[in-house]
Design a protein with these regions (language model features):
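Alpha-helical scaffold segments that flank or form the walls of functional sites
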Residues: 67-149, 180-198, 439-446
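Histidine/acidic-residue-rich catalytic or RNA/ligand-binding cores of hydrolases
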Residues: 67-68, 242-254, 282-287, 304-313, ...
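Histidine-centered catalytic micro-motifs
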Residues: 51-63, 233-240
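Glycine-enriched alpha-helix->loop->beta-strand junction motifs that scaffold or abut catalytic
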Residues: 225-231, 265-268, 285-294, 315-320, ...
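Metal-coordinating catalytic core of metallo-dependent amide/deamination hydrolases
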Residues: 125-273
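C-terminal cap of metal-dependent C-N hydrolases
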Residues: 382-438
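N-terminal metal-binding scaffold of metallo-dependent hydrolase/deaminase domains
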Residues: 1-38, 48-49
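His/Asp/Glu-enriched, well-ordered alpha-helical/loop segment
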Residues: 262-269, 311-391, 406
Length: 446
């Protein structure tokens, strides 16, 4: 059993003094006390301790494009062509190497859990690997090496657009039918449960988008997902681009949100990623369903997607979570800050999300999205902690409760996942100095 002591820590939406956190052998919080001094043998954490960030949307291999796509202008759709090129060259071995480095960067930045929206399932020509879960297991092994908690969202991807088959470059994403995808998903769940303990790696479901899952397949997918039980997370890219909305309306007469509602896919298990271009009816439907909305501010800014109606969605009853998506940066604090900054730009008003609400989006919102017992320093939750420096050049003078408005990942001093220190003083417990991780990232991007 490990006991941590922090001079200041985030408990129940505020900063408390002199906090002692006892973790059991399963890596969960067994006891929390505030207003107590350290005891002999306690591990003293530096700075101000917050719950670890929960990254609710990741495409690990997109990290290969960071800083390499900005000299030609374009849009989301031209960027996508570059992304397909990277997807085409992935193998299980290279994907594991890439994801290990990316997940290590996440942990060092303060993300302690990640939902990986994964659709590169098969060989480039669409045939299965001899090990049918080779790509998925590569991600699971990468998460274990990096020390991050993984929700592996196995994605259904069947068409390139409404009424259009997958292109040659998309062949490795598809299973041929919703039934075949569900069969493979069920087998993957069984395999992961056999090899990984609960909370380390878990399996969820994703529909890539309404344009990538034919209307006739939505009912099959909905029934199959429901059969897995209420705890199975379901994620979908939703209304990221106006062109998707226009095509959906032309093909079905519904917006993407309305189409999901028509097929029984709205509900508390659903995480709608981006949700950038919504009608008032869409917002009301998502709020009434108690859905989670995963905003990815750095990616949405990088790709010129737009600013989603996060404030209106929260007011309607939705939960807000955060994701790093294509990893233009990996920084939960900056991601949270950009959520508020986007709202300020769109509304002309400050304080649309308070610092406490931004911390909640970075932590509790992601817990709702992944179904994991994380995001809070409380009894029963996993003991995932990040220690933030309140005295750096960026944070000096900031109030402890407002560090989310000034700190960056460079101010993360120590990261604990499951009661074990994974990163401290620029060194990863398994992978060594973070400079080595950086060299790996540089080499795989070439």
């Amino acid at each position: 059993m490990t006991v941590f002591w922090a001079g200041r820590a985030w408990l129940d939406g505020r900063v408390a003094d002199d906090v002692r956190v006892r973790c059991d052998e399963a890596g969960r919080v067994a006891a929390v006390e505030a207003g107590v001094g350290p005891e002999d043998g306690d591990r003293r954490l530096p700075g101000v301790v917050y719950p670890g960030g929960v990254n609710a949307h990741s495409h690990a291999f997109h990290r290969l494009l960071r800083g390499r796509t900005h000299d030609g202008g374009g849009s989301f759709w031209t960027w996508r062509e570059l992304m397909y090129r990277e997807a085409a060259r992935l193998t299980p071995e290279s994907y594991q190497r890439i994801a290990t480095a990316v997940y290590a960067e996440m942990v060092a930045a303060g993300w302690t859990s990640v939902a990986e929206f994964h659709y590169v399932h098969h060989q480039p020509d669409g045939t299965r690997y001899a090990e049918p879960h080779a790509m998925e297991l590569a991600l699971a092994r990468a998460a274990r090496a990096a020390g991050i908690r993984l929700t592996l969202l196995d994605t259904c991807y069947l068409s390139s657009g409404f009424g259009a088959p997958l292109t040659e470059r998309q062949a490795r994403f598809g299973d041929g039918s919703a039934e075949a995808w569900l069969e493979r998903l069920a087998a993957l769940r069984t395999r992961v449960a056999q090899e990984y303990p609960p909370g380390e790696v878990s399996v969820g479901a994703a529909l890539h988008s309404v344009r990538a899952v034919p209307v006739q397949a939505l009912d099959v997918a909905a029934a199959g997902i429901a059969a897995f039980g209420a705890a199975m997370p379901l994620h979908v890219h939703l209304s990221e681009q106006p062109a998707e909305n226009e095509a959906c309306l032309a093909e079905t007469g519904f917006t993407p949100t309305e189409l999901l509602a028509e097929h029984g896919l709205l509900g508390p298990r659903l995480s709608a990623v981006h949700a950038t271009h919504l009608t008032r009816t869409d917002i009301e439907l998502l709020g009434a369903a108690s859905a989670t909305i995963v905003m990815c501010p750095s990616t949405e800014a990088d790709l010129g997607d737009g600013i989603g109606p996060a404030h209106a969605l929260r007011a309607a009853g939705a939960t807000i979570a955060l994701g790093s998506d294509q990893h233009v940066l990996l920084d939960p604090l900056v991601e949270a800050r950009m959520l508020e900054q986007g709202e300020r730009l769109a509304s002309g008003r400050r304080g649309r999300f308070s610092p406490a609400e931004l911390v909640a989006a970075m932590t509790i919102g992601g817990a709702a999205s992944t179904g994991l017992e994380v995001g809070e320093i409380r009894v029963g939750a996993f003991c995932d902690l990040i220690a933030i420096d309140p005295d750096s050049l960026r944070t000096a003078g900031s109030e402890d409760a407002q560090l989310v408005m000034s700190a960056t990942s460079a101010d993360v001093l120590e990261v604990v996942v499951g009661g074990v220190t994974r990163v401290a003083n620029g060194v990863h417990a398994v992978l060594g100095p973070l400079s080595g991780v950086a060299r790996t990232l540089a080499s795989v991007a070439r």
